[in-house]
């Protein structure tokens, strides 16, 4: 989640690859299946009932995606349970032998925050070229677009020309929004806001604006129903729409289009992708407690958690299983 020219073809390849990684809201291939825009990692958690307690495919895929859901397979069941037990002791803040929904929510939020800052740390050195522990806009621009800017002829007749031409001003606009003191240089906190704008209150207008720009194909400043559907689903000519598409059309009319004018403005887009009444960590914590609470006392013992260990290994409570492969002292 370094670009630039280290050799002609290698530089181009790295630039394109990292452009895809670090500007996910800009480059989007047309999907053939449903795509979720709502800014929350477990997009549909709480919107449809989980599978039975014998299968956690829904949990893993909702939290991770299909590929990352296999992370927990790195350890044997006994190793997973042993390490999960140590994590449970840390989640139980008051040491009363129970894990409450609130304690789980606090832990999940901590894991989320750590994941974001770890992600920034991994790419920091690629952009901080003068090693002053700050990243200027010029450093970022050269690392990201240097090859493109230095070799425009190679891109002139390609789709990449349009892509980079669109990305550069958008990245600059987002960088300036994250740069709170306006010095065109990002601290780690500011660069984190640049890479993960959905996590910062002062960046949410940028998230809304970029979403509008991505979906609004006719350029009228609104998202109509067809644009809303086209962002989620690539329709085959004369082909039938899946049932979920029909359901999304109903969602658009009944819940997205608040003023019933047939289109979404910025406020309605904000309400859609940044719902104020949804706490992702709270929803997941409640889900984990509900699925593991055998005696229905609305809190979990270590035994209840370990009995349902494979659900927790695949959830954000263990950073999708990654915490189980770390030394306990790292947590």
From Swiss-Prot:
GO terms for biological process: camera-type eye development; in utero embryonic development. GO terms for cellular component: endoplasmic reticulum; endoplasmic reticulum lumen. One of its GO terms (molecular function) is calcium ion binding. O-glycosylated. O-mannosylated by POMT1 and POMT2 and elongated by POMGNT1. Ca(2+) 3 binds at residues 179, 181, 183, 185, 190. Residues 79-114, 115-150, 166-201, 203-238, 244-279, 280-315 form the EF-hand domain. The modification Phosphoserine is found at residues 55, 80. Glycans are attached at residue 53. Ca(2+) 2 binds at residues 128, 130, 132, 134, 139. Ca(2+) 6 binds at residues 293, 295, 297, 299, 304. May regulate calcium-dependent activities in the endoplasmic reticulum lumen or post-ER compartment. This protein has four functional calcium-binding sites; potential sites II and VI have lost affinity for calcium. This is Reticulocalbin-1.
